[in-house]
Regions:
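Histidine-centered phosphotransfer motif of kinases
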Residues: 92-99
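Membrane-anchoring alpha-helices and their flanking helix-loop junctions
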Residues: 1-87, 99-167
Length: 167
């Protein structure tokens, strides 16, 4: 598959899995939902913020990192980044795209209030934390000392709120 084909395939797989399939199963597991206006507003705000952060991260990765976000368990589905990204959304945490997805799912969970959907969300979080660990090993191999310095000063997933004061 050509670079452009791999790129498109990576985006398509990511969209289908993270924005369609997992939320579909969260809703399926939740069964009947009857949210009030407050929960609906909270869900919409969190979902929009999460998707916004993820999209910003993807666009930044394409433009600055010159790569594609889909590299699953050390298998290259889309072209890997050629440059280490340490600015933009990547200055607040090393995995802003994943943080955005977690925020999106948290919004859905507030809407659904389902322990079954919460278990799916928790399983997804555990799988993705394992993926992050594998990805960080690859980034250390690919970018060496530069990545280790970035890793030392930037949190993996949960932003240090004090870092916003510095920027």
């Amino acid at each position: 598959m050509s670079g452009t084909g791999k790129d498109k395939a990576g985006y398509l797989v990511g969209f289908i899995v993270f924005i369609c399939v997992i939320p579909f199963f969260m809703f399926l597991l939740a069964g009947r939902i009857d949210p009030g206006a407050g929960r609906m507003i909270c869900c919409i705000v969190l979902a929009a913020a999460g998707i916004g952060l993820s999209v910003w991260s993807i666009v930044y990765m394409k433009r600055v990192g010159q790569g594609n976000p889909l590299d699953a368990f050390d298998h290259e589905i889309g072209p890997r980044t050629k440059r280490l990204m340490t600015d933009g959304p990547y200055r607040i945490c090393r995995n802003p795209m994943l943080l955005g997805v977690f925020i999106f799912y948290a919004g859905l969970q507030i809407l659904l209030l389902s322990w079954k959907a919460l278990l799916l969300f928790a399983a997804f979080v555990l799988i993705m934390l394992y993926q992050v660990k594998m990805e960080e090993q690859r980034l250390e191999r690919d970018f060496g000392r530069e990545y280790l310095e970035y890793k030392k000063k930037t949190p993996a997933l949960l932003p240090d709120l004090n870092s916003f004061k510095k920027h």
